[in-house]
Regions:
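Glycosyltransferase donor-sugar binding loop
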Residues: 218-236
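Carbohydrate-associated surface elements
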Residues: 150, 170
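Conserved donor-binding/catalytic core segment of Leloir-type glycosyltransferases
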Residues: 182-199, 205-209, 220
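Short alpha-helical donor nucleotide-sugar binding micro-motif in glycosyltransferases
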Residues: 255, 264-268
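N-terminal strand-loop element at the rim of the active site
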Residues: 8-13, 31-74, 227
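Short hydrophobic beta-strand element within catalytic cores of glycosyltransferases
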Residues: 294-297
Length: 374
């Protein structure tokens, strides 16, 4: 059986907190029928360095705090870098395909190193976000994958490769589904995502302000509160607004683990998704839709590939967003609501199940492996 090695950075696999790229990797890897899947990623204190789980071999790389402090921060000499350690794992696995998940520093050199060691390994770069590749030299890629047509068409300085393919994100439709329970009589309007300015969380605060005098509505913001300076200042600005508006109908709930996030969507009667223009897909959208939480969004071009206004969601521009959303929610009748969330669920089942995404990627692997051109 041929082997695939998925290489990632930033979060462990499987992810213990919201991480769309690592979720994609884990969900697809454990559904591969025709390939032996391996992941190479950073470590997590709650996970072993080596693990076989759900049919996937996980290889986690630990860089100690002492190493990071002395060699990376003080000396600035990464003598045995993350990429060096990844390369050693690749040599041990000896895969047929190396599948890089998103870009991290030095991938272009690492790809070159892998190809020099074994020219028969197929190297794939899978992009989920925009990056500045103007001065990057990717000369050893066999394929480039993007998560949306929008990203493929609008990625400036897209690396040269023999194959280009769009493969969408997915959702576990068996897990992310409507659970027939009702927690209380209040109508919950929710947001899920990192608490950073790129996620436009301030629109949730403004929406909560619009509903201030309607006690049957509550607002929940679920997402990682990042302590880095700029991000934390943004979070504090949101808290300041809540106090300034004297809001008692909104709460911040810190990050929840991926295996519980489907329950959060089931708690939400409405999921608010105020996307920026650069959002390449938006996994939150299909997760909410799969759970039949009514999606109200400001859509990006990437998310418009599946978000269809008045068909499976409701879309608004940022101009007067909160006022327009309030008016829409207050006037939404059950038949229309039911039609839209049913359409959304059906779309997820037909187009975005992880089984379908895994089937698509395996077909593409076969195409890449069968290529014998130089």
């Amino acid at each position: 059986m041929k082997k695939v090695a998925y290489i990632s950075n930033f979060y462990a696999i499987p992810p213990l907190k919201g991480a769309a790229v690592q979720t994609w990797t884990n969900e697809v890897a454990k559904r591969l029928w025709f390939y032996e899947p391996h992941t190479i990623c950073v470590d997590d204190e709650f996970l072993p360095l080596k693990e076989y789980r759900d049919g996937v071999y996980h290889h986690r790389i630990r860089l100690s705090k002492i190493y990071k402090r002395i060699f990376q921060k003080i000396l600035g000499w990464d003598v045995y870098s993350y990429n060096d350690r990844v390369f050693n794992e690749v040599k041990k696995i000896n895969p047929d395909i190396v599948h890089f998940q998103n870009y991290h520093n030095g991938i272009e050199s690492l790809a070159r190193k892998i190809k020099t060691w074994n020219k028969d390994i197929k190297v794939i770069l899978h992009l989920h976000n925009f990056y500045d590749f103007k001065n990057k030299n990717f000369d050893k890629l066999d394929a480039v994958i993007t998560c949306s047509d929008f990203l493929m068409k609008n990625f400036e300085y897209l690396p040269n490769a023999k194959f280009y393919k769009v493969i969408k994100n997915g959702v576990d439709v068996d897990k992310f589904k409507k659970i027939n329970f009702k927690k209380d009589e209040k109508i919950i309007i929710g947001f899920i995502g990192r608490i950073v300015s790129q996620k436009n969380v301030e629109y949730m605060i403004e929406l909560a302000r619009e509903f201030k005098n309607l006690p049957e509505y509550n607002f929940k913001i679920i997402g990682e509160i990042i302590k880095r300076k700029d991000n934390y200042e943004y979070y504090k600005s949101l808290v300041k607004k809540v106090k300034e508006y004297n809001l008692n109908n909104i709460e911040f709930l810190d990050n929840i683990s991926p295996d519980k996030v489907h329950a959060a969507y089931n708690d939400f009667d409405f999921t608010i998704i105020p996307l920026n223009d650069k959002e390449s897909f938006c996994m939150v959208g299909i997760e909410a839709m799969s759970c039949e939480s009514f999606v109200i969004a400001r859509a990006s071009e990437g998310s418009k590939e599946y978000m269809v206004d008045n068909e499976n969601c409701k879309l608004f521009d940022f101009d007067n967003f909160a006022k327009k959303v309030k008016e829409y929610i207050l006037n939404l009748k059950y038949p229309e609501r039911h039609r839209i969330i049913s359409n959304a669920r059906k779309m997820c089942e037909e187009n975005f199940s992880w089984d379908k995404i895994a089937e698509d990627i395996q077909k593409f692997y076969k195409e890449v492996l069968n290529d014998t051109s130089k």
